[in-house]
Amino acid sequence: MNTVSDLSKFVATRCAIADISLADFGRKEIAIAETEMPGLIAIRDEFAAQQPLRGTRITGSLHMTIQTAVLIETLEALGAEVQWASCNIFSTQDHAAAAIAANGTPVFAIKGETLEQYWDFTHRIFEWADGGYTNMILDDGGDATLLLHLGARAEKDQACLNHPTSEEETILFAAIKNKLAQDPTWYSTRLEKVKGVTEETTTGVHRLYQMFARGDLKFPAINVNDSVTKSKFDNLYGCRESLVDAIKRATDVMVAGKVAVVCGYGDVGKGSAQALRALSAQVWVTEVDPICALQAAMEGYRVVTMDYAADKADIFVSATGNYHVITHDHMAKMKDQAIVCNIGHFDNEIDVAGIEKYKWEEIKPQVDHVIFPAANGMPEKRIIILAKGRLVNLGCGTGHPSYVMSSSFANQVIAQIELWNAVGTNKYPVGVYTLPKHLDEKVARLQLKKLNAQLTELTDQQAAYIGVTKEGPYKADHYRY
């Protein structure tokens, strides 16, 4: 922006943020984050001269954090035009949003925004000032992808919007109906311009595979989540640090000695369980998958059911990506002052709607007492709900550390380049794909430099013996890390 008035006009017309005066603070934190994101910065430096994303207009729906600011500026450094919204109503860091807005990027993200604002912002990231269109999506959880597909379906028959199953669906469906009243082809016009999407998280990937199986998916997708340097690092090591940070920021509770239940023992659950055990909690795990349950048992965790644990544990963490894992009846059985939180993507892992009938008392932002009245001979009690059942590490903390997000976001940038460079070819017909192994290994190499790690190099004889090249890839695609 050339002048203060130019910036003020831009923010007023092309952004929705909390406070532009936070931009300098955000810029200082972005500078620190860049020093902790070696993989992402190396990708920026490697490709800047080539401008491989020139011509892209990327709509981004992903937590608007300091680390995401580094991702956005990397995409722009490689030639992309970008518009951004957060994928969660509580996850925005307002100083990060301000810094990005001050740099001239349209951003629509406010910590604590309403659901109405959330879906308005998700629409606005598809509307460009010159009337042009998005041609690439960078998604986290799949809401941006869902919006265009569901809206285009509703253009043909709005009956698909008649039976919402949650408060959020009620608000989303109303927003789509309102947009269709203004422009009956708003969604299909934009949908047909999109060349591909890169998806960040497990929940969004599940959506993509379901859409493809039904024949609904209209463009190719790269599943970034299942890159090894994403899922085995962000999901596991990121959660291992950010979960307990969020719980302690929110409650100041002593974790040691308490019984903590982790629902789900995938990568996120594994990291969560490790973190709680490191603080000397007694960790119990719930699982439906016997393989994951066996892994938990072999790590020394007690494998139980929620029905068994509900009235015994002190801390409950949902990490499944599934629906109503912690139910109203579970919470009704819990101890006074039990802590309940979710580190999965959506808020329906915990049956928050089922306890809305009780009195809620805000302790501080994103920390609430839910007061259960005396019943069945039991006295009144309070349980602590964090982030209203939404993503706790970003609702009550600042999310994963920059270093681990560097791996995830390096994969995102590589995936955007891969899809965009394949436009006009038959390399990626409509479907869901993962990045090839050699790119996964490349990200790992770039990250290792920060840690002063020394890689052993195969001899010619060793490489021949195991049937690989000296440069890699070193493992078959089916290898489980």
From Swiss-Prot:
The keyword Cytoplasm applies. PROSITE patterns: ADOHCYASE_1, ADOHCYASE_2. GO terms for molecular function: adenosylhomocysteinase activity. Its EC number is 3.13.2.1. Keywords: Cytoplasm, Hydrolase, NAD, One-carbon metabolism. Its main location: cytoplasm. It catalyses: S-adenosyl-L-homocysteine + H2O = L-homocysteine + adenosine. Coiled coil: none annotated. Binds 1 NAD(+) per subunit. It is found in: Cytoplasm. It comes from the Bacteria. Transmembrane segments: none annotated. InterPro entries: Adenosylhomocyst_ase-like_sf, Adenosylhomocysteinase-like, Ado_hCys_hydrolase_NAD-bd, NAD(P)-bd_dom_sf, S-Ado-L-homoCys_hydrolase_CS. Its cofactor is NAD(+). One of its GO terms (cellular component) is cytosol. NAD(+) binds at residues 201-203, 235, 264-269, 287, 322, 343-345, 393. Pathway: Amino-acid biosynthesis; L-homocysteine biosynthesis; L-homocysteine from S-adenosyl-L-homocysteine: step 1/1. Substrate binds at T65, D140, E200, K230, D234. One of its GO terms (biological process) is L-homocysteine biosynthetic process. May play a key role in the regulation of the intracellular concentration of adenosylhomocysteine. Belongs to the adenosylhomocysteinase family. This is Adenosylhomocysteinase. It comes from Polynucleobacter necessarius subsp. necessarius (strain STIR1).
